[in-house]
C-alpha cells in the first residue's frame, strides 16, 4: 500500500483480471452496528466470501476450452496463449489477477467518526491496511 522506499515502483501482474468484486464498506459497517457484530469480523466474512468466489471462478474458467477465445488462447494474445483449440485454459489463468475492490470509503469515515475522509483519514487507512493484510494472507 505504501512504497518501500523512494525507488519502489508499482508492479502490474497479469494481463487479465477474472473479475473484480467490490466491498461496500459503509453497508458492512452499518450491518455490524445494527446486528451488534464486530466490524472486522463481518469484514472477514465478506473477504472470505470474495476469496471463495474468486477461487470458484478460477476453477470454472479453467475448464473452458481455448477455442472460446482463439486470439487470446491459441494465437498468443494472452501470455502463454499458444494452446490447441481443445486445450483447457487453466494454465493461462495463473497469470490472471482477481481483485478485491472497495467503495464508499468517505461514507465509512462519516459513519465511524462523523468526519469526512479529508478531515480524518485514520479509520480509512486502518481499514485499508486491514484489507490489504488479509488479501496478502490469501
Predicted regions and their residues:
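Conserved catalytic cores of very large enzyme subunits
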Residues: 1-94, 115-137
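Contiguous, well-ordered alpha-helical segments that form the cores/surfaces of helical PPI scaffolds
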Residues: 98-111, 129
Amino acid at each position: 500500500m505504501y512504497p518501500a522506499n523512494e525507488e519502489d515502483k508499482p508492479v502490474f501482474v497479469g494481463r487479465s483480471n477474472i473479475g473484480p468484486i467490490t466491498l461496500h464498506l459503509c453497508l458492512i459497517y452499518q450491518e455490524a452496528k445494527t446486528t451488534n457484530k464486530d466490524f472486522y469480523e463481518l469484514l472477514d466474512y465478506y473477504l472470505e466470501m470474495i476469496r471463495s468466489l474468486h477461487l470458484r471462478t478460477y476453477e470454472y474458467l479453467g475448464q473452458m476450452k481455448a477455442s472460446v477465445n482463439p486470439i487470446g488462447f491459441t494465437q498468443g494474445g494472452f501470455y502463454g496463449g499458444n494452446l490447441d483449440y481443445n486445450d483447457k485454459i487453466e494454465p493461462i489463468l495463473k497469470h490472471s489477477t482477481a481483485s478485491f475492490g472497495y467503495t464508499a470509503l468517505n461514507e465509512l469515515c462519516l459513519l465511524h467518526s462523523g468526519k469526512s475522509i479529508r478531515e480524518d483519514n485514520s479509520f480509512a487507512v486502518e481499514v485499508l491496511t486491514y484489507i490489504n493484510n488479509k488479501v496478502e494472507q490469501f
